[in-house]
Amino acid sequence: MMFRDQVGVLAGWFKGWNECEQTVALLSLLKRVSQTQARFLQLCLEHSLADCAELHVLEGEANSPGIINQWQQESKDKVISLLLTHLPLLKPGNLDAKAEYMKLLPKILAHSIEHNQHIEESRQLLSYALIHPATSLEDRSALAMWLNHLEDRTSTSFGSQNRGRSDSVDYGQTHYYHQRQNSDDKLNGWQNSRDSGICISASNWQDKSLGCENGHVPLYSSSSVPATINTIGTGASTILSGQAHHSPLKRSVSLTPPMNVPNQPLGHGWMSHEDLRARGPQCLPSDHAPLSPQSSVASSGSGGSEHLEDQTTARNTFQEEGSGMKDVPAWLKSLRLHKYAALFSQMTYEEMMALTECQLEAQNVTKGARHKIVISIQKLKERQNLLKSLERDIIEGGSLRTPLQELHQMILTPIKAYSSPSTTPEVRCREPSLMESPSPDCKDSAAAVTSATASASAGASGGLQPPQLSSCDGELAVAPLPEGDLPGQFTRVMGKVCTQLLVSRPDEENISSYLQLLDKCLVHEAFTETQKKRLLSWKQQVQKLFRSFPRKTLLDISGYRQQRNRGFGQSNSLPTASSVGSGMGRRNPRQYQIASRNVPSARLGLLGTSGFVSSNQRHTAANPTIMKQGRQNLWFANPGGSNSMPSRTHSSVQKTRSLPVHTSPQNMLMFQQPEFQLPVTEPDINNRLESLCLSMTEHALGDGVDRTSTI
């Protein structure tokens, strides 16, 4: 993902947070910048706020003890609103004004707890006070007591069925408060409690608070905050019910914008739109009340806090390495079943996949939820079959758009690393060679390379030698992966997509989507190191291909993307210049002749069509092995029989059905027809052919351990 895309995603999250969440997120990020960056940001902020008269008025009121004292005569609703707008503007060191705030806060919190109202605003006030540089250790100690009261109050009302939903109460802030107690009144790495979050003291910049991760305690971590911002790991969610007089400050279930894949459908229902987000530890919102003894995660509206459950009380498989359960909270959220996250946090991956309605009924799960959970788990069990279906579709030359969308959604579902009961000697003997020579390109089986070699050797004579399929690679090409090896099946499909991208016409959208998918796989714990090395090699090859196209080619693709060349039939091969001739002006047409410089036959034999296709037709009926290779040949020859990629064994121009004689230099560069010579300054076709041939050869030699051949 490019930097601008990352900024766009972050901006999308940021817009969805409320002011309190935004403040905490920015404070967390500011602790990661250098002194120069911090000073620059300070200058920018001071400059932009210099003429903000309204802010100066609010700041004056926020630091006036007399005005704050008068708020005690106002209604509780108005006082809460005033505190939310003025407390963040309190200047560190203004002890008199701070004392007035500390008098008001207990009264407001007591009223909120007693009447079970304004819980969201109360939590925001507590968060502001806890992260404010003006508060002392004693102040935070008093505020922690109110957190306990909020916990007790909502716990008492949890069993009442006559009460509606309340926003979650953060038990975990008490835990983090104790960490803050060890910081000697140093907040977030600034030594002096009078230092604000922006005003930086250069001499104290590196003074990090003990007991705080990365020098900062993230008191808030909303359900929409990405894992890279939250520095504390996620816990399961406990949402406690109460009266439904909560704050109207409410945001949607998820504020994360969709993935950068335009018009992405829901596919087979793996995830809903709100869960098409970057992978990472996710915390849960408070739209429903889970049956959970665990700590809660911030509800929507307040952004709340992300916290850890007391490790001595219960097991949490969501946080266990290699459990395959890390993505269960996000998966449940996409199904709107996240209220049962605590129930799943006590299960292993195998127990979850074997759940029945009877077991769920014993856990007091409602009938509708039981049915939905069982159906959703059944869909998880069908993922491997779906991957096989996608693999067949890709091999048959179908569109890559839908498979990529399915893969994007599937990678967000719970996936556990496959552990084979026993490793066969054949696999063990093949593993060293694969590890020593990881394939750098998109992996194909030896069948395609053998076919390519035979075609190359027959380039001069115009014939085709029958390809030989090695026993090892032939087995890999037909043998299915073990049942349950979802990462292996996923990797195999990714290889098929890579092959398709390398040999079909450039599609920037598909390439970008594929690279994003690779990034998710590379950080997923379910994939083995061997699989990740293979995925990384495919990423490097696709990136190399992406960079090899002139920028104009990618920009012009949208002009002809919808046009199809009849000569290609159903082939997904490179489009010819005739398919876009109508969309591009033919000014100053020229007739290009083949120059004396030729690409070596070992490279071009792969694309020689006349002998390739005819020989393939002659041998198909008599040789079942070659019939298995029929789909492989589709990648390199025109199944419709047109001479769209003739061999370059001639020295004169020959008119073909798929490419007119009169073309523009732009068309020649875009489609790189091997029968016509490109200018010496544009050697893209040579580079691409070399890369493709080298790719096939190296992948055939490196085929091995995890049985993820791309053919």
UniProtKB/Swiss-Prot annotation:
The modification Phosphoserine is found at S168, S420, S573. This is Protein Smaug homolog 1. It is found in: Cytoplasm; Cell projection, Dendrite; Synapse, Synaptosome. The gene is Samd4a. Residues 323-396 form the SAM domain. The keyword Acyltransferase does not apply. GO terms for cellular component: cytosol; dendrite; fibrillar center; synapse. Residues 568-581 have a biased composition (Polar residues). It holds the Pfam family Vts1. One of its GO terms (biological process) is positive regulation of translation. Belongs to the SMAUG family. It comes from the Eukaryota. One of its GO terms (molecular function) is translation repressor activity. Its main location: cytoplasm.
